[in-house]
Amino acid sequence: MSAVGAVSAVIAATDATSLGSSTLSLIAIAMVVVATGAIGAFGVRMARTTSDFLVASRTVRPGWNAAAISGEYLSAASFLGVAGLIAVQGPDALWYPVGFTAGYLALQLFVAAPLRRSGAYTVPDFAQIRWGSRRLRAVCTALVLAIAWLYLVPQLHGAGLVLQQVTGLPRWVGIVAVALVVTANVVAGGMRSITLVQAFQYWFKLMALAVPVFVIAIITRPGVQNLFAGQWAESGFGFGGAHPIAEVYSLMLATFLGVMGLPHVLVRFYTTPDGGSARATTVRVTALLGAFYLFPTIAGVLMHQLMPPPVAGESADSMLLQWPAVAVGGTVGNLLAALVAAGAIAAFLATSSGLVVAAAGVMSTDVLRGRVRDFRWAAVVAGLVPLAMALPTTSLDISQVVGMAFAVAASTFCPLLVLGIWWRGLTTAGAVAGLIVGGGLSLGALTVSVVLPDAWPEPLAGLLAQPAVGSVPAAFATMIVVSLLTRSALTPRVDAVLAALHVPGPARRAAATPERPAR
């Protein structure tokens, strides 16, 4: 409480008109960090057991859970990246918010309730329940960590970008600060603590975008912009390449199906009391995301009219941070810029917290012994590894890097969960082969596109950057073909497990308890 009082005293003692944008932004960011710590500390008082740290003892109701899922899901890509891409690339970038939201419809239809009925704590837990294979569990563990850390790195880069924009400090300061705050919060209270934090941060992020959009739209009153026919006819504009439509379809596949494979999203469905609550949570999440994504879309359109495009070498992600000062200026512009900067920091904190919990949960149960102390040590590792990855690397556009994580998730856990839940014929060999093929193709293509971006002719270069159009069908096909070739390996227990996944109520008791791998 003393920190809150100190920040309040600074604000009360300072005339807003005499403050620059940097000072106001720093105050706003400090308030968000203090609020995050205070709410997290409240949650720590309720976190005692391993179940509290991993899944909040499965007691989170749909309303709270939906706000928390939305809070952690609306990452740097949603807050900064979407608006910047729409401002620069035009209407084709709308596939990002559409895909980010529509993925929850597929999650609701195919995965949410059965996944909760499985009784798992993590995706590797689900794999062990469904197939009873330690080998498959180990592959899932490696993929959870790969996706979580691939997703975490752009969050840290985004934090560095924000602090650099508002203070002029080096990027590494913001990267280190967010990594340490997130790790400390997760170590202290686990899932129980970050549920409250993420729910608060959803509503704060919504306000941090909605208020600037309304105020700037009212003040500037942008006029109607006439578009020529050719501007609408350039299908795939912004994606480039000789076959832009293929890249758009690839992005759609990655975002529509990738939600089903994101470990920090899936782990939140283990926190609900039952399968019905998981499905109700998904409906509410879809509504909350739809409401939020209206505002970065409108902001992108307004920025396209009011701001020049970024210069060569400058990321589109910084446009939203500069927008209030360019569009309005003065005290109002500084206040709005501070609000946007604070909302961006909230986005980094919420998403990073969920990713660290997901990675720590997997490491604590699969590598360590699953105790509270093990979770805390795993959280330290889960926070420091992406920090070590982020410091020496150069940030790409945040939405594009996050899109890479979606592509890997869509190529691995999406086919595993969909086929594992709805097809009894998926064998252990088929699941392992599909994960290796999907993960290998997507990770390999993305690595090549980042390391050697100019070494490939079109259309290959574009498809390497957006590999889901090839890697997702390949993963599904591999799982099906290998399973058909090894169908003699199916055991009678699969029927009992599938009944537990699909039949509500007492029939769930037939499911096996997840076995822990040998130490």
Predicted regions and their residues:
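Membrane-embedded helix-loop-helix hairpins and adjacent transmembrane boundary segments
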Residues: S2-R519
